[in-house]
């Protein structure tokens, strides 16, 4: 999710969507030799606002790290992110049960009172809870443009754009729930004014990790994990997840391949054809050579910053909705 700072995460370039390619770049966001990053004003606080809005704990001490990998849209060969000390952790989002199909609501045939760990996930008989493992700060990369012909192009205007990455626990069990989660997060983060939240502009993007639990002959099987990258609409999330579930089930029935904790398939979504396509297979323990970002020292998150972030969150939207319903009899 891209944040609404005036400048990019670690330089003074304007943080704005669009424009002529490669016109809002500088030596810092391109990673040129000798260029030194600095944390832009408001970046950490906006990350804390998002974390508090999503019911997270805010770290008192954190740092930035370098994640090394090669890809054409990553000009400097590494991405500034947070590895082992994320800014936010242990949050949750409550999804209204009324938005689920009737058979998944209280008393329905597919009603799920607990998550995969057996913990209660139904709150006040009104909400289904999805836990958030962590929210970390990182910079965006450039944008690849695949036009007709033999060539692809890179627009580096987007590189260095301030992001938060929201990582959930594996609590969602259907494509509808995944799409509803994304809609709810968009609604919350727009409400606290940390992002525009326009999926069509890339302000929010979704990577969906999917595998199946298959009961057969009294035994539980787990299919290999697939990660569908860069889903940019609620329909794409729902349709891609629906197709991938069907593809995995068919593949399991044909070759009985089971979950391998060290293996993951990266998929893309071909919206025109309505299918997922393999982009690459990889060891999920791939070595990104994480190291502490040497040009940005670790820092303490002050009580004043957290207090200021809490004031910007104000009364959360769910609580305000409940209060309006009780005080004014709204439905």
Task: Identify the meaning behind each predicted range.
Residues 1-315, 320-322, 326-328:
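Basic, nucleic-acid-interacting segments
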């Amino acid at each position: 999710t891209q944040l609404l700072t005036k400048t990019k995460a670690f330089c003074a370039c304007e943080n704005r969507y669009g424009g002529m390619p490669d016109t809002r770049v500088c030596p810092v966001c391109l990673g040129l030799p000798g260029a030194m990053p600095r944390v832009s004003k408001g970046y950490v606080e906006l990350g804390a606002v998002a974390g508090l809005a999503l019911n997270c704990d805010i770290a008192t001490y954190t740092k930035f790290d370098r994640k090394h990998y090669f890809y054409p849209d990553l000009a400097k060969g590494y991405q500034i992110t947070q590895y082992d000390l994320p800014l936010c952790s242990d949050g949750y989002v409550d999804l209204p049960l009324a938005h689920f199909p009737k058979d998944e609501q209280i008393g329905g045939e597919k009603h799920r009172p607990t998550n995969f760990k057996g913990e209660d996930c139904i709150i006040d008989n009104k909400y289904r809870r999805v836990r958030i493992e962590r929210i970390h700060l990182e910079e965006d990369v450039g944008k690849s443009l695949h036009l007709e012909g033999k060539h692809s192009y890179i627009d580096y205007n987007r590189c260095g754009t301030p992001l938060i990455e929201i990582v959930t626990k594996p609590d969602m069990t259907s494509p509808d729930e995944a799409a509803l989660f994304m809609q709810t997060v968009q609604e919350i983060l727009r409400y606290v004014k940390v992002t525009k939240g326009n999926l069509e502009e890339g302000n929010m993007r979704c990577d969906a990790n999917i595998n199946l639990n298959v009961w057969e002959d009294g035994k539980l099987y787990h299919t290999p994990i697939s990660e569908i990258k860069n889903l940019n609409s609620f329909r794409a999330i729902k349709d891609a997840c629906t197709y991938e579930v069907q593809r995995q089930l068919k593949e399991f029935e044909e070759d009985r391949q089971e979950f391998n904790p060290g293996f993951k398939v990266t998929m893309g979504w071909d919206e025109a054809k309505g299918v997922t396509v393999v982009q690459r297979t990889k060891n999920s323990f791939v070595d990104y050579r994480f190291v502490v970002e040497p040009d940005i020292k670790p820092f303490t998150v002050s009580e004043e910053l957290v207090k200021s972030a809490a004031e910007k969150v104000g009364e959360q939207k769910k609580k305000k909705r409940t209060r309006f319903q009780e005080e004014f009899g709204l439905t």
